[in-house]
């Protein structure tokens, strides 16, 4: 093939020399003529290697002058031209323009001659029955530069001789219909699966290579299927750089789902689910957030629901803890209205399924308390009590919270602060003063919240006090002493007076009044 290049260089040099002589008397503008240079690296041993004479070998052309001499001559001629300005058409007389156009004809003829020589050469290879991979190497397409997937010129698709090879493959397959060869195995000699995928995706963005790239992508997928490549492997190839947002409408994802269906049909004993590769690639939390958003869109609702069901099933089969799933579902960032969200209901169903499957039960409170802490749990309970559909869950959460305090040996006075005085929406402000020794003490409140003794929080705390005294008899605490430590005498007197007027609190008011008198 080097001989062809030499012929082109000689003819081009001759033509440029002729153009130079014709245009010598013309007035030029400031623009300069840029002469392209042959920059593709050629190995020294290939330059010096003599072409074999005409016989049954791969080349049929005698050797000619050295390429170095031709390039030197060509450079000398082009230097003469590039030192002059490029003429515009309006500055060139008609007769001169005609002469210039005529002088350019040899260049066109040189290109045409090179094309004919290349056609003759490829036809000779075809007659000899050379494989498509052999011709790929003869055209030196396997020696291109380091891949650059940002522009087509950085891939094999951007090399001039690539189209020659593509045409050869078509001609070879037309001549050998029973021995057709795919381009994919040859391209895989220079690219990994990932590299070829990137190159094909880039080629699909160019109108000149879109059709070929689309065809090759189909061949690549079929080869993966024939080789029993797992859907997980193919997913990694398809979604190399794609983000999880918009995944379900991504054309490559849609093509991948078809691959999964085809794989399961062809290999029924190795059936694969779509969800695991997605979760492995993006993570459970990102996938679940994406699926929740996709379920709200009619176009993707069905596939999102299907994938979410698969994800929950996989998590349950892998015995993932409810706490892990709680975070994976992004429930740790939901806020006070946690109990009323659809995702919490899904998680709660997971919790129940997990507890049926495992002897070591998980509580409703544990993951919520881990991320929201006690005060946050109190706010979630308060918000949940406002919604009829979540009242029972709120009560269940409050009871577990209460049991946690008791198990942790938190004294009733601390529980009173947490359950009543510091509850969300409380209308009192707790203040502290400092003693001489530097320790803080709580300042007694001069007001008791209205309806305190009839509130659910007080009833819960009262039960907590009884349970505490039963469980820790040597650490018994008195309700009257706790009240007197937290409230002023005037505040307690007003509380007792108001409680006497309420039939539901008359009994507790009487008990407290008697207890205050004994303290």
From Swiss-Prot:
A motif (RxLR-dEER) lies at residues 49-59. Induction: Expression is induced during host plant infection. The RxLR-dEER motif acts to carry the protein into the host cell cytoplasm through binding to cell surface phosphatidylinositol-3-phosphate. Keywords: Host cytoplasm, Secreted, Signal, Virulence. It is found in: Secreted; Host cytoplasm. Belongs to the RxLR effector family. It comes from the Eukaryota. Effector that enhances P.infestans colonization of Nicotiana benthamiana leaves. Residues 1-24 form the signal peptide. InterPro entries: PexRD54_WY. This is RxLR effector protein PITG_15278. One of its GO terms (cellular component) is host cell cytoplasm.
């Amino acid at each position: 093939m080097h001989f062809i290049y030499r012929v082109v260089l000689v003819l081009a040099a001759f033509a440029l020399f002729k153009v130079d002589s014709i245009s010598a008397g013309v007035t030029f503008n400031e623009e300069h003529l840029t002469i392209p240079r042959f920059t593709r690296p050629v190995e020294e041993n290939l330059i010096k290697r003599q072409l074999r004479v005409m016989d049954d070998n791969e080349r049929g052309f005698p050797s000619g002058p050295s390429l170095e001499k031709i390039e030197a001559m060509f450079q000398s001629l082009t230097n003469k031209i590039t030192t002059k300005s490029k003429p515009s058409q309006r500055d060139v007389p008609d007769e001169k323009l005609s002469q210039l156009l005529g002088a350019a004809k040899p260049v066109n003829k040189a290109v045409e001659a090179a094309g004919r020589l290349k056609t003759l050469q490829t036809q000779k290879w075809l007659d000899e029955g050379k494989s498509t991979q052999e011709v790929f190497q003869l055209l030196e397409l396997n020696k291109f530069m380091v891949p650059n997937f940002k522009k087509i010129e950085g891939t094999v698709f951007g090399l001039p001789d690539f189209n020659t090879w593509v045409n050869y493959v078509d001609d070879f397959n037309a001549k050998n219909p029973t021995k057709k060869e795919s381009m994919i195995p040859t391209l895989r000699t220079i690219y990994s699966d990932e590299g070829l995928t990137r190159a094909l995706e880039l080629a699909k963005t160019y109108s000149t290579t879109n059709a070929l790239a689309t065809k090759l992508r189909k061949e690549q997928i079929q080869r993966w299927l024939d080789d029993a490549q797992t859907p997980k492997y193919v997913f990694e190839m398809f979604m190399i750089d794609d983000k999880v947002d918009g995944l379900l409408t991504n054309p490559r994802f849609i093509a991948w789902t078809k691959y999964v269906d085809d794989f399961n049909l062809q290999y029924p004993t190795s059936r694969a689910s779509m969800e695991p590769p997605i979760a492995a690639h993006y993570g459970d939390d990102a996938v679940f957030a994406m699926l929740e958003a996709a379920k709200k869109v009619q176009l993707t609702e069905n596939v999102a629901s299907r994938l979410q069901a698969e994800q929950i099933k996989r998590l349950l089969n892998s015995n993932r803890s409810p706490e892990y799933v709680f975070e994976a579902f992004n429930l740790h960032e939901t806020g006070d209205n946690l109990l009323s969200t659809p995702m919490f209901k899904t998680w709660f169903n997971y919790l129940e399924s997990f507890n049926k499957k495992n002897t070591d039960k998980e509580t409703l409170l544990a993951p919520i308390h881990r991320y929201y802490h006690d005060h946050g749990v109190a706010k979630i309970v308060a918000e949940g009590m406002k919604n009829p559909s979540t009242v029972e869950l709120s009560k269940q959460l409050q009871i577990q919270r209460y049991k946690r305090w008791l198990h942790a040996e938190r004294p009733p006075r601390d529980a009173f602060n947490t359950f009543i005085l510091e509850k969300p929406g409380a209308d009192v402000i707790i203040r502290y003063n400092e003693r001489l020794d530097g320790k803080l003490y709580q300042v007694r409140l001069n007001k008791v919240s209205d309806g305190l003794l009839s509130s659910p929080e007080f009833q819960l705390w009262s039960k907590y006090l009884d349970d505490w005294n039963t469980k820790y008899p040597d650490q018994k605490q008195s309700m009257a002493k706790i009240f007197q430590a937290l409230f002023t005498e005037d505040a307690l007197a007003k509380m007792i007076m108001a409680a006497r007027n309420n039939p539901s609190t008359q009994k507790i008011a009487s008990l407290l009044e008697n207890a205050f008198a004994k303290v």
